[in-house]
Amino acid sequence: MVARLLLARHGQTEWHAENRYAGSSDVALTEEGLRQADELAGFAAAAGPSAVFCSPQSRARRTAEPSAKALDLPLRVVDELREVHFGLMEGRTRAELAEADPDAVARFLADPVSGAFPGSEPPADAAARGAGALRGIAADVPGETVLVVAHNTLIRLTLCALLGIPLENYRTVFPRLDNAAVTEIEIDGTRTGLLRLNQPARTRYWVT
């Protein structure tokens, strides 16, 4: 039975506002990020998902909390939805790393999988855990619609894994996911369909 998953990236954080890679680091939402969380809650209230899941990281939890509250639902934390650990890149901008290690940046830009930043979680591992998490959620909620709040790179890698897209293409096929924007997928066993990508969480975009 098909489950519909509404995948939302967390709201803006202090580091993302500065184009810093946050990864596994815990970084607070900005005022704009808090506003985006409230906007997502407005979307959730209109969409009416039956459950709200999120990553254990504070930026995802803080983004998901207003939606869970608006729906009077418990927030269900899934550890496997945490963001990719970026190793040497954590807390840095790409320009800063380019000064310290230009070869590392060049390898990443050429192939973000084989050229992943030194010390980072292997992208294939992140994609596998993300896909496993979403398939597990879908299996638990057959026929239902749920909201899942997670992270930019984790969601993009997971989409590639679920849709059969080569992982090394995740940055070109899915160049970005905006803060608090929603991507809609359907999962039925091992089959996944992409319905909408990176849509702003304003209810007028979701009238069907």
Specify the residue positions occupied by each region the protein language model found.
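Acidic, low-complexity terminal tails and accessory targeting/binding regions
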Residues: 1-3, 84-96, 139, 144, ...
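Generic beta-sheet signal
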Residues: 5, 144-152
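Phosphate-handling substructures
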Residues: 69-131, 196-198, 207-208
